[in-house]
């Protein structure tokens, strides 16, 4: 009877060690996945924020500016 309880205890300890490693692996993989998911979102937010407050003209604005400068040159 003493032997069976010892056997059960050692099996339980082995099981807990395996589950502990599984928990660590899950935390690591989850953290890496979360990092890459938020990295992309932060990059998009950063680009949107910078687009609001920088003076970059759009392509359509550039085309209209070029056409106005060409028409002004032709008038001179």
Curated annotation (Swiss-Prot):
It is found in: Membrane. Its main location: membrane. Residues 60-76 have a biased composition (Low complexity). It is a single-pass membrane protein. One of its GO terms (cellular component) is membrane. The chain crosses the membrane at residues 21-38. Keywords: Membrane, Transmembrane, Transmembrane helix. Residues 55-76 are annotated as: Disordered. This is Putative uncharacterized transmembrane protein DDB_G0291326. It comes from Dictyostelium discoideum.
């Amino acid at each position: 009877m003493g032997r069976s309880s010892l056997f059960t205890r050692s099996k339980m300890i082995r099981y807990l060690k395996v589950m502990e490693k599984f928990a660590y692996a899950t935390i690591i993989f989850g953290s890496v996945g979360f990092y890459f998911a938020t990295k992309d979102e932060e990059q998009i937010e950063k680009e949107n924020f910078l687009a609001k407050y920088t003076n970059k003209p759009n392509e359509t604005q550039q085309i209209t500016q070029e056409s106005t400068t060409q028409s002004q040159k032709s008038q001179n």
